[in-house]
């Protein structure tokens, strides 16, 4: 797993990406929309904390169940935690901090919804004036994937159910597989609700840019 730091900012109407924290001192912070930390060192986190005057939670804190979907608002920042589903149905806890319109995302692994979101920002940079816009898109993109996974599982459950014969020994295996898939669907549904809760909390926070609350 590669450690990676990326800063996304606007320059002359285009999206720029930097991999150096020194960029913070060079760009106008109003142009900075997103700092993505993927498995970075404590030193990088500390430097960023001091520069932006934020607090980045430790892995253990983010992983605690009651923390994993929490939403905290102070007078100048928002902290939201949400678990992102991996292809193997494992959950990756991610922490988001927004301050002065800048989003900081903290995670420990590659997430395809993040790569997809970056493509969306490149394709339509003007639609992402702040970190709030980035966060909503990250959550929406993951929810789209989650919905696709549910659809796929539901199709599999349906076709497996059709193969059931009442007096067949194979049925036991099929039933176990169906039950396993149904449990996965529950986990994914939970995840979708979790993302929707974060978005609705963001909208209620009063810090949200007006164009997004429509």
Regions found by a protein language model. Name each.
Residues 1-213:
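Peripheral, non-transmembrane regulatory/ligand-interaction domains of membrane transport proteins
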């Amino acid at each position: 797993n590669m450690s990676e730091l990326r800063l996304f900012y606007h320059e002359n109407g285009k999206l720029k990406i930097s991999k150096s924290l020194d960029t913070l001192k060079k760009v106008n912070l109003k142009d900075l929309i997103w700092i993505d930390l993927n498995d970075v060192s404590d030193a990088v986190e500390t430097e960023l904390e001091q520069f932006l005057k934020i607090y980045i939670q430790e892995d253990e804190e983010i992983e605690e169940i009651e923390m994993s979907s929490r939403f905290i608002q102070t007078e100048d920042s928002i902290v939201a935690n949400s678990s992102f589903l991996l292809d193997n149905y494992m959950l990756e806890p991610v922490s988001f901090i927004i301050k002065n319109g800048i989003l900081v995302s903290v995670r420990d692994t590659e997430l395809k919804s993040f790569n997809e979101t970056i493509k969306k920002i490149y394709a339509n940079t003007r639609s992402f004036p702040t970190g709030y816009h980035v966060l909503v898109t990250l959550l929406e993109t993951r929810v789209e994937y989650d919905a696709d996974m549910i659809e796929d599982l539901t199709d599999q459950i349906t076709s497996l159910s059709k193969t059931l014969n009442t007096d067949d020994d194979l049925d036991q295996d099929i039933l176990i597989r169906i039950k396993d898939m149904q449990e996965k669907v529950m986990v994914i549904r939970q995840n979708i609700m979790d993302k929707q809760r974060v978005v609705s909390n963001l909208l209620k926070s009063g810090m949200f840019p007006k164009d997004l609350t429509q």
